[in-house]
């Protein structure tokens, strides 16, 4: 058992493979686990295990995702790989599988293809900041100049979408050769180089407890003679008794209040942190000043907004979504954290309508402000059922 305990002491990072169909994402994922398993750092998965990924339901959307885990000397990784292109699109937009960084797989024999571009664009929209490139199938390219050309193309493509194309690590190799010869030092060198690049280039993510305090309010009640209690699950940061916080959302104004008590499982605490379900006792707040759908947050860390741009995946009929397209000016409900707010949608210029199964950029104007930042996920609902899933990519006002 001692070993299992040691695993947890390594920093944890979530990554995934992205890139065009048949460029070797799944083969690379299998090769990483097989090569590292040989060094005692993973359980080996073969191609078929990963390829027949189970269907998962995330907010009613069907996504096929394979999860594998492995370690390097320095870190523990959770790695996602999706069999189909549509699965990637859904995964990235819904945030079903969080990625702190990604390995972009490009076939050296083919160069960047349409989905290579699309995955880079989506990654930049949904907040993946770090990409490491694996130029795969290098054994199929005889001319070293051709390899250099493909590498240049990939770097230019990354720069086009605001990634630091010149600085991104690019590793060249053959995932299949490594998978077939996991003990041959020469065959596995590219895999080891890739893991070293991932280790050093993709930073350890900031832990939720290090971020500014934020708690979406789920319920509010009054304790006679003591004040108003707001309950919810702390999403980020740490809260101490005596801290001043702001109530944000549903009104233009923010209201500052002091937390005079924190209760969890009927016990009083001095502090609460990310992941805790708590009741926060607030001084000098009327029951009518605060409601579900607002958030408690560290002063000036988050602001209420009504206009934003979102990247949205529209559910297919088979996923319980709409059976028909919607048009410019469509007014559904937008579900943020704990509440629905009506908003109107403006489609990109030249776009007449959106079909179920599409993913698009849309401009949204809500009728009441919501505490939001870029990267916040939301659902689009109509009569209580989810018809779309999205992420805020830009705050307008």
Swiss-Prot record:
> Where is Mg(2+) bound in this sequence?
26
- GO cellular component labels: cytosol
The reply to whether Nucleotide-binding figures as a keyword in the UniProt entry is yes
Residue ranges for the region (G5) are 174-176
* GO molecular function annotation: GTP binding; GTPase activity; translation elongation factor activity
Residue ranges of the region described as G4: 136-139
Q: Where is this region: G1?
A: 19-26
Q: EC no.?
A: 3.6.5.3
- Binding residues for GTP: 19-26, 81-85, 136-139
Region G2, annotated ranges: 60-64
Q: Where is the tr-type G domain?
A: 10-206
Which cell locations does it reside in? Cytoplasm
Say what the protein does. GTP hydrolase that promotes the GTP-dependent binding of aminoacyl-tRNA to the A-site of ribosomes during protein biosynthesis.
Give the record's family classification. Answer: Belongs to the TRAFAC class translation factor GTPase superfamily. Classic translation factor GTPase family. EF-Tu/EF-1A subfamily.
Query: What is the protein's given name?
Result: Elongation factor Tu
- Specify the species: Clostridium beijerinckii (strain ATCC 51743 / NCIMB 8052)
* Gene it is expressed from: tuf1
